[in-house]
Amino acid sequence: IWTCTGAANQKWTAPSGGTTPPGPGAMAVAPYLYNGWGSPPSPTTVMNATGVKWFTLAFVLSNGYCNPQWDGGRPLTGGVDQQTINTVRSAGGDVIPSFGGWSGNKLESSCGSAGELAAAYQKVINAYGLKAIDIDIEAAAYDSPTVQQRTVDALKTVRANNPGIKVYITFGTGQNGPDNSLISKAAASGLTVDSWTIMPFNFGGAGQNMGQLTLRAAEGLKNTVKSAYGYSDDQAYRHTGISSMNGITDNGETVTVNDFRTILGYAQQRHLARLTFWSVNRDRPCTGGGADTCSGVSQQPWDFTRVFAQYTG
């Protein structure tokens, strides 16, 4: 549940069709949609078929000079990504831009200070009147203690300047949960994150039950967040999330629609803050292994989205 109590210099934009905030599950379920990859589907087609209202829009990167652009090359406003946002909002939904990802030039690395990074985040927040942002910190960016601390400090500034905004951090994990480096830095610095979201795939799960492996990793995440922040179990669950990968993963793991049902049941019982996946571009059937446009497993179009769209928080 969110509130909009921003300062006078902010530009908040309500979704078309009213100003009532979404239910607890609506913002929590925002599958990744990537305009730079994999024949991106029409968001309204997915919305109409599944009931999902929100998308996590990938990826905001740096153009090389700490300046945010979509994929580091498409314009921040006025291009295909703004068209997508306008389309989703006109249909009664909204978006959560995701900063980072696996590849490309990351703002978190290219910006020279926390202040510059916070200003880059703010530029995107102001451009679209955002209610939430996702920091997808992976690869070399995650591995750098300097970049981790810069990101934490920048997000503290974003929180101070944008009351009510949701801050999600998405990062990799092992089968027993993630390491505690970034979570510990955030807790020690006084940064509260609405959802620490793990990506429980590409972690050696080929030939194993990925639904059960996901739950094991999520329990490890809960324990790490609980320890760092001094939360109760219930508080920790409510500050964590899962971002799965549908179908055949990059490392040959298989995540089925039934695995998504298992994950959904876990999330419902524990009231996770976020339940998402990579990606709606791939939520289409094909055989012979996953690709950027399909899952590689037996399914009907948008089956994975339909499962997570049932999440109510």
Regions found by a protein language model. Name each.
Residues 1-19:
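Lectin-like carbohydrate-binding module/patch detector with strong preference for beta-trefoil
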Residues 15-24, 313:
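N-terminal low-complexity, Pro/Thr-rich disordered segments
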Residues 23-231, 235-261, 281, 285-311:
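Chitinase-like catalytic core of GlcNAc-active glycosidases
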